[in-house]
Amino acid sequence: MIIPERMSVYINSLDVGNGAFLDELEQEALRDDVPIIRQDMQSFLKVLLAMHQPKQILEVGTAVGFSALLMAANTEMCHITTIEKYEKRIPVAKENFQKSGMGHRITLLEGDALAIMQELTGTYDMIFMDAAKGQYIHFLPDALRLLRTGGILISDNVLQDGDIIESHYAVERRNRTIYRRMRE
């Protein structure tokens, strides 16, 4: 998130931690270069979860299950549906859900998020998008269709640490297409 440092310090000061299981999972993910949400987003999510107390959450982009487990640990009576395409990470996420003792509150859907979202029915109180940033624009119509009136849509790191506002030529060549799509 790009927020003033004093706000970030304040939000993080409210955070009481994630517990041993999530702390260990976070360290493993960082060690293995698995992208997971940063500390400031973790704290922000916890505040939103406490304020809104969602009962149904859709997560787009499971990775190893860290965010889904964080949301499950910080809600009561909430079910999380999460979507993951990367075959290498799916069994790891499933194992983490089982080990955590919260797996009964999480449904993992395997495959392309766009195709899966088009088939989903019902509504969600919160949708958390943390997948391929360049695909967010394609996810948006279904995300809005699936979001209940008054629900919360969170798209992680859409500003790419501020790089999205840089000149086309100031951005590394490999990131130009992603940033162009995100500007749309």
Role assignments for model-derived ranges:
Residues 1-126, 133-154, 158-184:
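A short alpha-helical cap/connector motif
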